[in-house]
């Protein structure tokens, strides 16, 4: 590893030094190629060109150029390296640049060259002993925070961190300046204050500003680190306290030095990623697969990260989570043991004891190797000898590749139907067409590793022409009863699915979007345009093919997962898994949904699925209903004035007309005509939310153009919004939201707009501008005296307001933010643009963030293949 780093550093400084670090044989090969006049270099599996061979190819290209010829380099790969590879990815990009042509996996499937598939997710909770460890970890963290901040010095530090001065009414004062200086740290310090000094006056008032959520582990640890750096480290007499703090933080996975703190290997995330419960989940998955309509076709492989090593936290006794331990669990179950499983790693070959007498001879015949029962290694985990038999190779030159081919042959024969192994051996390069079920227990999430693993099941199987692959990911989630936050597993799931295509499962079964499902809205008249489905896959014959979790989790499943992660004890993993099981009822149905051999356009586009959460972010319910009440009162008041006039003058038609004219003049002078207009616009937005999402899309596009980001955008004339419908979560009906797409806009421009639209409806972070959705905005629309008066009264009676964040690209220039607000007011309703600058803007930002979290709005960008 050090030699590789040195070579890379030297060659980055001077490419001519490459020849000095390469072997003479490599230099001789380059000389022969250049002398032969080669100009075109074709590199298959080019994703391997990350280190040594990248240097060789780089030198070859330089030598070809030096000979007077411009080289042509063609790289072929099915798995691009990940940007997470850092310098290696930079080396690769330096050779090939951006991708010039890509054939998405769905196209290869539709052409009939790969098997159709479905990506599935199975959820589990940590094992009992791991839950004991996690509960203890949670308790220790709380005790640690209390010990650090319970004393007078800790309390003073927290109050100093939030800038607390006193209480003004029901709000703490002094916090605004600290929020402006460092919002994230100040919010974390305030959260710790609330949960460690709940009876302090500041702690009693802060929840109204920032909420009552517990601080995350990361944020709490960083507050502790700053306390140690500022209060303990400078005092030489507190050296022992400093070292004790360092040791404690190390136990939580953080390394504290005099230069700051850095995150290490988080023990909570390690336990979740390598939980023993995943082995039980793998067995459960096999059970359900065998019980499905296509159970007789199942040939499964369980892939683990390590053969014998793994997480030991939370395991007082017994083996660690590994491939060996997983195989022992498989053999202990009667159903999975009946599939005649084999464990195969680079160093291990295990079989079920009940199968040893016939599997070992079969492997010897297929591999040509001499095999024998192994008595075991004292360094290996202990196993139940009556269930598992270790096999050793007695041949002088054993080859893992030979054994892999032999085991693959048994899988193809159907003699062996379950294989357990490691990613290192069964990842890239392993070819067994009979395998149709992958159970991924690994912790990898990079693009290359994820696609390589799932590619193992996509080979066409001559013995099953209707083959459909099931690729399972197993995700361990924290039980709601444990307050520790651990989103690493969910983040890993999301990163994996961002790289994978699959059949969209978020639409109701049998739903076929029609022309009436679309809205055509334009920021200027555009005659002659008729709304049409964006692509052939929206015709209702086949589901959409998308990236992201939408091809693995139904809308109900996604809502239940969010509830589970938010600590709702009514949500359970069984509810999540029940949703998944509905997707594996018939592989034949999945085969039909892929439309093998059917025509397709081959285009890709982007859309965003948005949900307004509990309260739509495009109107302010308390203020709206207060304004309605005031309008009703105003009408009653005018009626009370006019009625005595009619009684006094009589009911002659002329006198009635005079009274009505008098009322109209009064209302006109006051500008009351605008009041029902504004209320009507808000009510219409509530009744037809699709128009609001559409208006937001136009507002974003106009804001991008005004911010000069639009130089790379086309003129936006129209867009379409496809409704999702509604789902039920528990006993509460929640809107599933809408999918916003731009089918007639070039993909690059559409992606820019879609990303910005998604940001509008995402939880608020720290934007430069906010949009306050009010009953009456500022100068974005003309106002009247009565309208301003009613708005003022309504907001005093019911001051609640909702906020949306102005997208970063739109808010880069103030002109873009102003145009966004102007378009919002024109197309959706009144609003007020708030610049998040200065201490006075921090309180609205805190209120906006709190309302956004409570509202539970969310959005996600997807890529759609047509």
Spans of model-derived segments:
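SF2 helicase catalytic motif II
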Residues: 2-72
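Arginine/glycine-rich "motif VI" loop of SF2 helicases in the C-terminal RecA-like domain
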Residues: 66-67, 446, 456-468, 501-506
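Conserved segment of the helicase C-terminal RecA-like domain
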Residues: 452, 456-490
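Conserved C-terminal RecA-like helicase domain
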Residues: 1-3, 8-12, 32, 37, ...
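A short beta-strand element within the Helicase C-terminal
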Residues: 420, 430-443, 469-473
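Long, largely alpha-helical accessory region at the distal end of helicase-like NTP-driven motors
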Residues: 150-185, 189-191, 488-808
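Post-DEXD/H (motif II) to motif III coupling segment of the RecA-like Helicase ATP-binding lobe
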Residues: 48-114
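Residues immediately C-terminal
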Residues: 47-51, 81-82, 309, 425-428, ...
């Amino acid at each position: 590893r050090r030699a590789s780093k040195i070579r890379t550093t030297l060659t980055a400084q001077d490419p001519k030094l490459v020849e000095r670090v390469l072997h003479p044989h490599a230099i001789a090969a380059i000389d022969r190629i250049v002398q032969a006049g080669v100009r075109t270099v074709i590199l298959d599996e080019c994703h391997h060109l990350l280190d040594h061979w990248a240097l060789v190819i780089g030198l070859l290209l330089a030598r070809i150029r030096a000979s007077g010829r411009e080289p042509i380099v063609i790289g072929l790969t099915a798995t691009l390296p990940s940007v997470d590879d850092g310098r290696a990815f930079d080396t690769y990009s330096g050779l090939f640049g951006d991708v010039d042509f890509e054939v998405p996996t769905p196209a290869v499937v539709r052409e009939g060259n790969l098997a159709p598939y479905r990506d599935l997710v199975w959820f589990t909770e940590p094992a009992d002993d791991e839950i004991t460890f996690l509960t203890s970890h949670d308790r220790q963290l709380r005790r640690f925070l209390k010990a650090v901040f319970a004393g007078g010095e800790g309390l003073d530090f927290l109050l100093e961190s939030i800038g607390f001065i006193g209480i003004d009414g029901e709000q703490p004062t002094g916090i605004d300046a600290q929020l402006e200086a460092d919002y994230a740290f100040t919010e974390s310090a305030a959260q710790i204050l609330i949960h460690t000094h709940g009876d302090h006056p500041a702690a009693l008032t802060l929840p109204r500003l920032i909420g009552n959520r517990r601080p995350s582990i990361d944020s709490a640890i960083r507050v502790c680190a700053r306390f140690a750096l500022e209060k303990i480290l400078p005092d030489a007499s507190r050296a022992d306290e400093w070292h004790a703090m360092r040791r404690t933080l190390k136990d939580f996975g953080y390394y504290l030095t005099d230069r700051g703190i850095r995150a290490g290997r988080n023990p909570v995330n390690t336990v979740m990623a390598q939980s023993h419960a995943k082995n039980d989940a793998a067995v459960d998955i096999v059970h359900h697969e065998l019980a499905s309509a296509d159970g007789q076709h199942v040939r499964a492989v369980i892939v683990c990260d390590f053969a014998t090593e793994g997480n030991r936290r939370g395991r007082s006794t017994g083996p660690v989570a590994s491939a060996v331990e997983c195989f022992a669990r498989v053999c202990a179950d009667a159903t999975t043991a009946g599939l005649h499983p084999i464990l195969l790693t680079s160093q291990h070959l295990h079989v079920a004891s009940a199968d040893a007498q016939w599997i070992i001879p079969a492997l010897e015949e297929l591999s040509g190797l001499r095999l024998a029962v192994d008595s075991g290694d004292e360094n290996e985990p202990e196993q139940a000898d009556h269930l598992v038999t270790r096999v050793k190779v007695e041949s002088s030159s054993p080859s893992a590749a030979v054994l892999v081919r032999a085991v693959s042959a048994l899988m193809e024969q159907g003699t062996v139907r379950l294989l357990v192994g490691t990613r290192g051996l069964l990842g890239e390069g392993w070819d067994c067409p009979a395998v149709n079920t992958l159970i991924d227990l690994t912790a990898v999430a990079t693009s290359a590793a994820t696609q390589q693993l799932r590619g193992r099941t996509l080979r066409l199987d001559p013995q099953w022409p209707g083959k459909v692959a099931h690729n399972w990911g197993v995700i361990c989630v924290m039980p709601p009863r444990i307050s520790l936050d651990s989103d690493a597993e969910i983040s890993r799931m999301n990163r994996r699915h961002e790289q994978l295509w699959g059949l969209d499962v978020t639409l109701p079964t049998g739903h076929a979007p029609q022309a009436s499902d679309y809205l055509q809205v334009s920021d200027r008249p555009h005659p002659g345009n008729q709304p049409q489905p964006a692509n052939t896959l929206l015709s209702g014959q086949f589901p959409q093919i998308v990236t992201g979790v939408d091809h693995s989790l139904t809308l109900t499943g996604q809502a239940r997962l969010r509830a589970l992660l938010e600590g709702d004890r009514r949500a359970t993993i069984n509810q999540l898994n029940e949703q998944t099981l509905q997707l594996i009822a018939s592989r034949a149905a999945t085969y039909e949904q892929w439309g093998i051999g059917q025509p397709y356009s081959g285009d890709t586009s982007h859309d965003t699925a948005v949900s307004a959460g509990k309260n739509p972010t495009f109107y302010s319910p308390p203020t709206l209903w207060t304004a309605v009440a005031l309008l009703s009162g105003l009408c009653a008041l005018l009626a009370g004035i006019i009625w005595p006039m009619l009684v006094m003058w009589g009911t002659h038609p002329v006198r009635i007309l005079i009274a009505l004219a008098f009322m109209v003049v009064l209302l006109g002078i006051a500008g009351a005509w605008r009041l029902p207009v504004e209320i009507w616009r808000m009510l219409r937005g509530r009744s037809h939310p699709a128009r609001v999402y559409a208006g937001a899309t136009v507002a974003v596009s106009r804001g991008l153009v005004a911010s000069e980001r639009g130089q790379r955008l086309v003129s936006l004339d129209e867009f379409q919004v496809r409704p999702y419908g509604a789902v039920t979560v528990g006993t509460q009906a929640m809107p599933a939201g809408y999918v916003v797409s731009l089918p007639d806009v070039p993909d690059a421009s559409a992606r820019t707009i879609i990303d910005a639209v998604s940001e509008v409806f995402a939880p608020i972070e720290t934007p430069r501008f906010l949009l306050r959705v009010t009953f009456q905005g500022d100068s974005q629309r003309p106002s009247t005296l009565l309208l301003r008066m009613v708005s003022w009264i309504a907001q005093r009676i019911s001051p609640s307001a909702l906020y949306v964040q102005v997208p970063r690209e739109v808010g880069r220039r103030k002109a873009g933010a102003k145009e966004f607000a102007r378009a919002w007011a024109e197309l959706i309703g009144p609003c007020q643009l708030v610049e998040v600058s200065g201490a006075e803007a921090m309180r609205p930002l805190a209120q906006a963030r709190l309302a956004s979290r409570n509202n539970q709005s969310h959005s996600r960008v997807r890529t759609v293949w047509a």
